[in-house]
Amino acid sequence: MKEEFINNRPVSMKAAVYHGIGDVRLEERPVPVIRDPKDAIVRVVRSTICTSDLHIRNGAVPRAVPGIILGHEFVGEVVETGSEVVKLSAGMRVAANCETFCGTCFYCKRGFVNNCEHGGWELGCRIDGCQAEYVRVPYADMGLTPIPASVTYEQALFTGDILSSGFWGAEIANINQGDCVAVIGAGPVGLCAAGSAKYLGAGTVVIIDRDEFRLRLAEKNRLADVTVLNGVQDAENTVRELTEGRGADAVIEAAGGKDTFELAWKLARPNAVVSIVAMYEEAQILPLPSMYGKNLIFKTGGVDAASCPRLLSLIEKGELRTDFLITHRSPLSQIMEGYRVFGAKEDNCVKWVITDGSRQ
């Protein structure tokens, strides 16, 4: 069958589509078109499978719309822009922010772009995402950032989601020079949080996880000064020994496990900040009577939707890097195998990258 083209683009494309709990399929979909003058169409060069995609598949994100194309973490090349897009043009290499924001509403004007009245987590949740050959990006001037010439697609790939999330988690933890910072979870966000904590001045970073491979990955890339194999080693005792019995000056919870929220506040010293960037599939309990007297500050939130330009600059300068997270690659045609392997954490899979596109 002869492939049809309009404006030098195919009419249809392959895409990973969410059809309901436990039901994700690779199927044929129309190539997206401009719907609003603030839109851009991007050819996807690299995309990933994220833990948030697994949460959608597992039914833990009720606002996700059945029938949408999954995916929100990608880089690519702009192929078309709407008439009101002024910062972008066809041919630009761009990194995408996983959050959609308008830049003009009540919250955006105050810098709280994650709470945009016209956006939020839209791509791959409420509207079609990037696990496809092309994607439409609303408010493109806000949601797409040009990639510096010296930065590769794969170096920039995680800027708009897991690096932004990890950096946000570290930044809201109020880390002071020389602090002991405990990071729970050596998954992609946790590893990014650890690297960000180092950049922000942490003196000792302790990473806690049940996966020995991921802990070794943290050590190899100098993200951790101390690692704790949870369930085998005692995280609370380790942190106390490092801090003269006080506890961590800041804790970043990036695991989202059944017992990791409790571990987070137990690791923290009195008057510490506990930063929660994990996404939980079950409700958590805040046992105030047990915590009374610790005077803890809890801060929560996901990706910082305004940080992409800053993070790309830090990547360009060599201050932060994330390319070591890529353990598996495949074309889009094999994405269902990616969901299986990434979801089961088989073969030491940290990030599965979809490599459709001609350049790195």
Regions found by a protein language model. Give the residues of each.
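Glycine-rich beta-strand-centered segment in the early N-terminal region that forms part
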Residues: 32-47, 60-109, 148-151
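Short N-terminal strand-loop motif that marks the start
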Residues: 1-75, 133-135, 139, 230, ...
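Conserved acidic E/D residue at the C-terminus of a beta-strand in Rossmann-like folds
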Residues: 209, 278, 302
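Glycine-rich cofactor phosphate-binding loops and adjacent beta1-alpha1 units
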Residues: 173-175, 200, 215-297, 336, ...
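C-terminal hydrophobic helical "lid"/dimerization subdomain
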Residues: 2-13, 233, 262-266, 305-360
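Mid-domain Rossmann-like dinucleotide-binding core that forms the NAD(H)/NADP(H) cofactor-binding site
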Residues: 89, 149-232
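NAD(P)H dinucleotide-binding glycine-rich loop of Rossmann-like/cofactor-binding domains
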Residues: 102-184
